[in-house]
Structures are given as structure tokens and as C-alpha cells.
Amino acid sequence: MPLISDLLALCKLKVVALILFTAVVGMFLAVPAPYLPNGLLVLSASIGISMVAASAAVFNHVVDEQIDAQMSRTNQRPLPQGRVSKNQALVWGVFLGFIGLGILQLFVNIITVVLTFISLIGYTIVYTLYLKRATPQNIVIGGAAGATPPVLGWTAVSGTQGIEYACLLFLIVFIWTPPHFWALAIYRVEEYKKIDMPMLPVTHGLAYTRTQILLYTVLLLLVSLLPYLSGMSGLIYLVITIALGVRFLVYAIKIYNNPDDKMVAWSTFMYSINYLMLLFIALLFDHYWLISPWEIL
């Protein structure tokens, strides 16, 4: 029997935590201030979305077992080390996905079930099985699956009401994904070359990738203004998102100007995670900041 710690390692809990965070923010933004979403609904949706996200991570481990065994970043994972068999991982992944979708069906709503299932298929089959090995645009196209959590959170609480605002959150995460992963790909480019993975730095070179990171970061700065321009968010969000975006742009320029410095790429990758978290915190803070605690209660 595999250890619980190994089964949890297959779930990529840190990634799931970021997914859950953006989904929960989507839940709160779906409700007009000063109101809060139903607590049981938030809990049920959070558990269901998290379990399906963990299921997708497990399937990713199964599909990428041979690749993981060849990379220093991943060769200590449970499957390459033989601590969990492929069949055990498959059963674990199916269990998580089935229970997660079941919770969403029983306690949330059908549209969230459908969108979550589409995201699961998009990540595990379209991205992991095909795009990841077929095209250097794998991150761009496959990023759609990873950008859905805020939409899932929104629909869990409000269905399709106001879903156009949820689509703005989707767009932000979608545009954020390429510079986030390409920065990591630059840092790990030699390993990707070793396994012949068609990541952008491998197929098109570092210079082209650095340019794409810069262009996508500029686009992200512009797209992040849409919640303000659409009336979804206010000045507090606008100020914070501009500050975060300019800082991200500084990192992108550093990558562009320092082609041989892998640590700049790593620093950019790490900042991109903080960027997304802080941007969603800004959305939430702006949503409630004029409301007194007594109004919320």
C-alpha cells in the first residue's frame, strides 16, 4: 500500500491551493457587496473543485511518469521512484475526480459540474496527453483549462448571472499563464532539451521566448485593467493592479536584457505566482473595502 504522503504528493497540493484560492475569490466576487456567499455552498464547491483539480494532477503524474524520471526537478516523485504504481495512481485519480464531481452535483449546480468536467478533460487529455508533446504553443492553448477556476467559483454561487465578469477573471489567468511557465521553461531549458519536450525555448530559442514573455506581460498589464474599465472593480484595484503589472513588466525586461542569467528567469517565475495571488486579493479587497463589518454580518 502506498503511503498517504505519496498519494498527497501526486495531488500537487501547492498548485491546487492556488487554483482553490482563485476559485474562492470568484465565489465572493459573484455576490454583490456587502453580502457573502452561502457558507455551505462555498465549502462544498471548494471541496469539489479541489478534488477534481487534485485528480487532474494525479493523471498528469501518470501520463508524465517517463518524462518525470528523466528530469532532476521531478525524478523524485512517487511514480518514478516506484513508491506508487501506475494502477494505484489511476485508481486514486478516478476516486478523487468521481467524488469531487459528485459533491458538485449534489451540493452546487450542474453548470459547475459540466465546466469542471470540461476543465478536467481539457487538462488531462487535450493538454497533458496531446498538446504538451505536440506543439510549443502547449502552454498557450492548454492554459484555458488552468484559467477556469475563477469561473467555476463564480458559477458555483451565481450560475450564469454576471458570468461576463467571470470571463474577465478567466482572461487574466489565461494571459498570465504563458509568461509564468515560459520563465520556468527558460530556467529548465537544458532539461527540456534532454527529453525533447517542445517547449518554446527549445523549439524557437531563448531570444524568441524572452520576446514573447515581454509581449505577454504587456498584454497582461492591459487585460488586468478590464475589471476596472468594465465597472466590476474600483480605484483600489486599479492602483494595485497597475503596480503589480509594472513590477511584472520590470521582471520581463530583466529577462529580455539578461539572456544568460537563469536566476532572473527563476525570480520572474516566483514573482508571477505572487502577482496572481496579490491581484486576486486586490479584487476581493476592492469588492468589500467600503463595507463595514456590521453590514457584512
UniProtKB/Swiss-Prot annotation:
Keywords: Cell inner membrane, Cell membrane, Heme biosynthesis, Membrane, Transferase, Transmembrane, Transmembrane helix. This is Protoheme IX farnesyltransferase. One of its GO terms (molecular function) is protoheme IX farnesyltransferase activity. InterPro entries: Protohaem_IX_farnesylTrfase (IPR006369), UbiA_prenyltransferase (IPR000537), UbiA_prenylTrfase_CS (IPR030470), UbiA_sf (IPR044878). It is found in: Cell inner membrane. Its main location: membrane. It is a multi-pass membrane protein. One of its GO terms (biological process) is heme O biosynthetic process. Pathway: Porphyrin-containing compound metabolism; heme O biosynthesis; heme O from protoheme: step 1/1. The keyword Transmembrane helix applies.
